[in-house]
């Protein structure tokens, strides 16, 4: 939303080297950009934005689900079979993962009654329009993979409800939180060497 220009950068899938830069056209004044690329088939790409929000990044929406939809459906349906081998942290909250060879963070949250859930944080100006999450079919669960190094950044979830109200809340599955009054969740890798046997 704070970009003044945007481009699709076609890259070599193996080396990541740039091949061609397609300019995008802004639609309206809300920072929504689009481009139609004719007859090129699927290709690897990054997005480039200029202006206040200048960046080069992989498109979060070009990746498949970062959580296993089968496990999501098992949780939704209350399948006891998943509980013997399942850890809540393996599905919900924020987890550092590698997806399609790209490192990033998987976000997943169950939000009954929400029409939109977004990840907001230091990395997107706390703007819920930047990283809206995808609803997993037939559930109230939302997920999104955000590529890149987000370690030591603060984040929360923003939910928009049918009545138009929004709520911003910390990740209940986070391991590290900002001190009050902010109370944001913090993406951090906890490493501790236990000394007992």
Q: Model-derived features: where do they sit?
A:
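Short proline/glycine-enriched turn/loop motifs at strand-loop junctions of beta-rich domains
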Residues: 1-5, 40, 110-117
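Proteins with a high burden of low-complexity, intrinsically disordered sequence enriched in S/T/G/P/A and R
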Residues: 1-9, 30, 197
């Amino acid at each position: 939303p704070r970009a003044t220009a945007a481009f699709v950068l076609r890259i070599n899938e193996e080396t990541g080297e740039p091949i061609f830069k397609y300019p995008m056209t802004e639609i309206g004044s809300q920072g929504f950009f689009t481009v139609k690329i004719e007859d090129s088939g699927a290709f690897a790409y990054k997005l480039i934005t200029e202006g206040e929000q200048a960046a080069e990044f992989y498109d979060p929406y070009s990746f498949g689900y970062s959580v296993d939809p089968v496990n999501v459906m098992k949780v939704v349906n209350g399948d006891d079979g998943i509980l013997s081998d399942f850890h809540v942290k393996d599905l919900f909250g924020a987890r550092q993962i590698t997806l399609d060879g790209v490192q990033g963070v998987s976000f997943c949250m169950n939000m009954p009654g929400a029409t939109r859930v977004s990840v907001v944080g230091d990395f997107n100006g706390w703007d819920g329009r930047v990283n809206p999450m995808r609803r997993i079919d037939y559930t109230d669960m939302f997920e999104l993979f955000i590529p890149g190094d987000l370690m030591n950044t603060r984040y929360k979830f923003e939910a928009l409800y049918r009545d138009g109200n929004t709520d911003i809340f910390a990740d209940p599955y986070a391991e590290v939180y900002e001190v009050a009054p902010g109370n944001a969740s913090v993406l951090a890798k906890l490493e501790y060497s236990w000394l007992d046997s």
